[in-house]
């Protein structure tokens, strides 16, 4: 029985030593590695963020055949600064509707700025931890990691899950005023990001014997920087989760804190 008790004490002591090393060394090393990943992610954004080049300009062609919908556009930063849009109406398939976006009234993609803001928040949570700070409990680390994970998830969701708006809200939306010429009141255009794609959707309200419904069609194009950003955000989340899982093992031992070893054990 005494040998068993001695073995248990030795195992507990070794676990305590590893716990202290993780808190004092490994947590800071992982936070530093994580910050490097997130700053690299920030540099991929087309808006000013962590000394990147700022407003990058790219051209895209979004089309669905046979000539049902086509948009030739310029994306500058988080806004569509120029676009030529043409599409066929479902109630008059031989008729082509045309409109455009000009530099004077750009179409803002709020998802880009939202994702950038959440990324900035995640980096700020890391910067709030001084390099010389000594974590004393697992709860401290889990609190910091939880805040970072929350910000990263919000950032990814901003790009993966576009906010859906009712068609009447789209028709009356601020961005619709960017179109020249303005579209008839039964038509709406929407630009949004979903995963690594830039998507244009056109909606038309239809009155079918007194019942209102809408017809829609969409076209898309792949955006390389979106793919890079989502991959780096995912890598950051994985690193956070690995640290969280490791710390959670120690959090089972509620009496584990830095300095809780007996004086005789401090020579280990």
Swiss-Prot record:
Keywords: Cell projection, Cytoplasmic vesicle, Nucleus, Synapse
Gene Ontology cellular component list: axon; dendrite; nuclear envelope; perikaryon; RAVE complex; synaptic vesicle
Annotated signal sequence range: none
Compartment list: Nucleus envelope; Presynapse; Cell projection, Axon; Perikaryon
Record keyword DNA damage present: no
Nucleus keyword on record: yes
Pfam families xref list: Rogdi_lz (PF10259)
Membrane-spanning segments: none
Family of this protein: Belongs to the rogdi family.
Role description: Plays a role in promoting sleep by enhancing metabotropic transmission of the inhibitory neurotransmitter gamma-aminobutyric acid (GABA) in GABAergic neurons upstream of a wake-inducing dopaminergic pathway.
Protein known as: Protein rogdi
Organism: Drosophila melanogaster
Gene giving rise to this polypeptide: rogdi
């Amino acid at each position: 029985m005494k040998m068993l008790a001695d073995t248990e004490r030795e195992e507990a002591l070794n676990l305590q030593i590893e716990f202290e090393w993780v808190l004092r060394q490994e947590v800071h090393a992982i936070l530093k590695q994580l910050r490097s990943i997130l700053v690299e992610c920030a540099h991929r954004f087309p808006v000013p963020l962590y000394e990147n080049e700022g407003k990058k300009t790219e051209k895209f062609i979004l089309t669905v055949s046979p000539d049902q919908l086509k948009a030739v556009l310029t994306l500058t930063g988080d806004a569509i600064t120029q676009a030529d849009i043409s599409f066929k109406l479902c109630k008059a398939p031989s008729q082509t509707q045309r409109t455009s976006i000009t530099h004077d009234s750009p179409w803002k993609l709020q998802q880009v700025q939202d994702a950038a803001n959440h990324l900035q928040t995640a980096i700020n949570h890391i910067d709030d931890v001084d390099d010389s700070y000594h974590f004393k409990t697992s709860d401290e680390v889990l609190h910091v990691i939880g805040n970072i994970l929350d910000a990263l998830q919000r950032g990814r969701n901003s790009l993966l899950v576009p906010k859906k708006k009712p068609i009447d809200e789209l028709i009356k939306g601020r961005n619709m005023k960017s179109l020249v010429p303005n579209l008839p009141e039964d038509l709406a255009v929407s630009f949004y990001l979903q995963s690594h794609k830039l998507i244009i959707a056109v909606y038309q309200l239809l009155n079918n014997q007194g019942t209102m419904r809408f017809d829609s069609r969409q076209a898309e194009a792949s955006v390389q920087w979106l793919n890079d950003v989502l991959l780096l955000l995912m890598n950051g989340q994985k690193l956070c989760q690995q640290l969280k899982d490791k710390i959670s093992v120690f959090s089972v031992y509620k009496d584990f804190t830095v300095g809780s070893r007996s004086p005789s054990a401090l020579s280990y």
